[in-house]
Regions:
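Glycine-rich flavin
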Residues: 39-47, 52-149
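Generic structural motif
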Residues: 53, 156-158
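Fold-independent oxyanion-binding glycine-rich loops
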Residues: 138, 155-156
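Alpha-helical interface subdomain recognition
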Residues: 1-71
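Conserved small/polar residues in nucleotide/adenosyl-binding loops
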Residues: 158-165
């Protein structure tokens, strides 16, 4: 198979993947009206391996190539741009790479199908407390937060020295 053609076998097979795309296309207005991708679509993304695609094999992931991942995202985005965004943004290894290994192990302790969401801007203040950090603020949006397993947030730089390496 040419490298520039999406291999649907990597994503649950042609029948499953095409049915997902058809369902996404049919429900675009619903997603727009609700201002979110429905939970059942996020679950189907998990089933076909969207969120474990780039997770290293040592953590139970599929460790697919970036090209394979992006071709899948492109197909979903062609069906609905917001669904493509939630599929691509929910992929978490890129965001977790900066964390200490023991934190990454905790995130994937129950399996690689972890859905990431983020409300990064504007950064908000964080304070060290027993057992972690207290983050207080309001983020204007958090892409994919309704279907997320883990939510990353931006913290203000005024606390950098206190929070480094955590």
């Amino acid at each position: 198979m040419p490298r520039h053609v999406l291999n649907k076998d990597l994503w649950g097979g042609a029948e499953t993947f095409d049915a997902l795309l058809a369902d996404i296309r049919a429900r675009r207005r619903e997603f727009e009206r609700n201002r979110r991708i429905s939970a059942d679509i996020v679950e189907r993304f998990k089933e076909i391996g969207v969120y474990r695609a780039l997770v290293p094999k040592e953590f139970g992931g599929d460790q697919k190539s970036p090209m394979e991942f992006l071709m899948m995202v492109e197909a979903i985005a062609a069906a609905d741009g917001s669904a493509g965004w939630v599929a691509s943004f929910g992929m978490n290894p890129a965001y977790l790479a900066a964390l200490p290994p023991e934190t990454v192990e905790k995130v994937w302790a129950n399996g690689p199908d972890v859905v990431f969401a983020g409300g990064i801007f504007p950064p908000q203040p964080a304070k060290r407390v027993d057992g972690g950090f207290l983050v207080n603020g309001r983020w204007q949006f958090g892409s994919g937060c309704h279907g997320a397993s883990v939510i990353g947030v931006g913290r203000s730089e005024e606390h950098t020295s206190e929070l480094q390496s955590h």
